C-alpha cells in the first residue's frame, strides 16, 4: 500500500512539481470516499474504478495549473467531484481561493458536501440547475465542466458569464473538433486547445470572449 501511494505521489509530482504531502493525503482520502460511495450511488462508471487515480483524479489535476493564480472557480454539473473536488484540494493547499459546485442530483450533492466537510475544503455546493445559479453567485474567474454536455449547449448555459471576463476550461474527448465546428454556427469565441496529459484523444478547450452570432 505504501509503495502504491508513493507511486501515485510521483505521478502527481510529474504534473504539479510542488504538491505537498498533505494535499496528496487529501487526494487519497477523496479516492477512498469515491470508492466507498460508488457502491451505493453512481458517481463514476464501475468499469473505471480500477483506473480511478489516473482516469479521474490525475485527469482533473491537470486543469488546475492552467490558471492556478485564479481564486474564484465554478464547476458545472459536478457529479462525483471531477474536477471540482480535486481543484478544491489544491486551493486548500494555497490557503486562498474558493470553488462553487453546481449539481442538480440530490444524492450527489450529499456526497459532495460530505467530502467537503471531511476534508475541510474551500468549496460550496449549490443544489440547483445551471440556469438558476446566476442569481446565487457572482461571476467566477474560471468555469470548468467535464463530460457534461455539448460545447454548443455549454456556451448557451454559461453565456451570462462567458460574455464577460470569465474563462471556460472544458474537458472534451475525441469528437471535440466536431463540437467546435457545430458551436461556431451560433457563437464566436477565442479558443485555445490544451492537449490532455492523460489521454491522447482528449483535450481541454480554453474558451473566452464569447459572442452570440444572433447579436
From Swiss-Prot:
Upper lineage is:
Bacteria, Pseudomonadati, Pseudomonadota, Alphaproteobacteria, Hyphomicrobiales
Compartment annotation? Cytoplasm
Question: Which keywords fit this entry according to its UniProt record?
Answer: Cytoplasm, Methyltransferase, rRNA processing, S-adenosyl-L-methionine, Transferase
Q: What is its main location?
A: cytoplasm
What does the function comment of this entry state?
Specifically methylates the N7 position of guanine in position 527 of 16S rRNA.
* Protein name according to UniProt: Ribosomal RNA small subunit methyltransferase G
Decide whether keyword ATP-binding is in the record: no
The molecular function terms of the Gene Ontology recorded here are: rRNA (guanine-N7-)-methyltransferase activity
Q: Which reaction does it catalyse?
A: guanosine(527) in 16S rRNA + S-adenosyl-L-methionine = N(7)-methylguanosine(527) in 16S rRNA + S-adenosyl-L-homocysteine
Q: Which organism is it from?
A: Bartonella bacilliformis (strain ATCC 35685 / KC583 / Herrer 020/F12,63)
EC id: 2.1.1.170
Amino acid at each position: 500500500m505504501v509503495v502504491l501511494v508513493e507511486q501515485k505521489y510521483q505521478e502527481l509530482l510529474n504534473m504539479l512539481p510542488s504538491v505537498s504531502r498533505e494535499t496528496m493525503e487529501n487526494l487519497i482520502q477523496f479516492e477512498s470516499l469515491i470508492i466507498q460511495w460508488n457502491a451505493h450511488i453512481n458517481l463514476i462508471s464501475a468499469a473505471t474504478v480500477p483506473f480511478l487515480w489516473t482516469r479521474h483524479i490525475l485527469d482533473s489535476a491537470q486543469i488546475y495549473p492552467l490558471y492556478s493564480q485564479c481564486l474564484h472557480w465554478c464547476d458545472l454539473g459536478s457529479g462525483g467531484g471531477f474536477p471540482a473536488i480535486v481543484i478544491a484540494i489544491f486551493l486548500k493547499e494555497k490557503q486562498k481561493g474558493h470553488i462553487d459546485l453546481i449539481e442538480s442530483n440530490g444524492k450527489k450533492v450529499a456526497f459532495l458536501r460530505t467530502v467537503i466537510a471531511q476534508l475541510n475544503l474551500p468549496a460550496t455546493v449549490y443544489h440547483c440547475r445551471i440556469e438558476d445559479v446566476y442569481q446565487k453567485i457572482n461571476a467566477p474567474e474560471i468555469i470548468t465542466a467535464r463530460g457534461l454536455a455539448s460545447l454548443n449547449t455549454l456556451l448557451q448555459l454559461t453565456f451570462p458569464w462567458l460574455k464577460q471576463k470569465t474563462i471556460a476550461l472544458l474537458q472534451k474527448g475525441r469528437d471535440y473538433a466536431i463540437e467546435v465546428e457545430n458551436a461556431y454556427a451560433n457563437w464566436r469565441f477565442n479558443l485555445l486547445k490544451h492537449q490532455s496529459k492523460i489521454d491522447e484523444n482528449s483535450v481541454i478547450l480554453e474558451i473566452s470572449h464569447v459572442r452570440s452570432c444572433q447579436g
